[in-house]
Amino acid sequence: MTYLSRSYSFYAAYHSNPVNIKIHQVCIPLLLLTALVLLHNFVITLINSKLQINVAHLVGLAYQIFYVTLDPLDGLLYSPVLYLFSYILPSKLFTIFSRSLVNRSAAVVHVICWILQFIGHGVFEKRKPALLDNLIQSLFIAPLFAFLETGPFVGYYPSVVSKIRANIKLKDVGENYPNLSEFLFPPSMVEDAVSGVVEDASQLSYCIRPLRLSDIDDGIVF
């Protein structure tokens, strides 16, 4: 399993509730944008040089290099978003509006998005946020994953998302199995078989489960 797959497995395990997923799809891009807007206030001046580097541009470039290293295709697809967030939008906002207004607005939106995400985890997901277990991974890779999860809306189905989500669905079904003594053979046998055959189990409209003794008693199996 690649580092990207392992990282998404970690992220997806904390984001399985549909409402919480939608909250993060909206809030994570806004968190990145507002953070870059605030970082746009700072510049780095090289020693013995008049050259100044905007911190927002530097952070955006670092994210871009990191994402392309993780996955060239998905990293390149996300590059216009990073360019927009780290360069175009901050520059336009500070040109059109006063610096104090932009900074205050960005800070407020940033805080609100964090609150909404904690609500998503506490109320809907009912599980602590991933950042409490792995802060660095959550902060750096979450924007790419939130972007990839919106891919199906435009007809793009990232393989890492569909495969990991399919495996999570199979595990969720396994956790809801009744008494294992009711089955003719272990549920794990079906999970392993299905995960190896079905490329995108998230598209299934039915549930695959092992045969139960009650199925035979009820005359379902002849």
From Swiss-Prot:
It catalyses: (R)-2-hydroxyhexadecanoate + O2 = pentadecanoate + CO2 + H2O. GO terms for cellular component: endoplasmic reticulum; endoplasmic reticulum membrane. Its cofactor is Fe(2+). It is found in: Endoplasmic reticulum membrane. InterPro entries: Mpo1-like. One of its GO terms (molecular function) is fatty acid alpha-dioxygenase activity. GO terms for biological process: sphingoid catabolic process. The chain crosses the membrane at residues 27-47, 76-98, 105-125, 135-155. Its EC number is 1.14.18.12. It is a multi-pass membrane protein. Its main location: endoplasmic reticulum. Dioxygenase that catalyzes the alpha-oxidation of 2-hydroxy fatty acids in an iron-dependent manner. Involved in metabolism of phytosphingosine and is required for proper endoplasmic reticulum stress response. This is 2-hydroxy-palmitic acid dioxygenase mpo1. It comes from Schizosaccharomyces pombe (strain 972 / ATCC 24843).
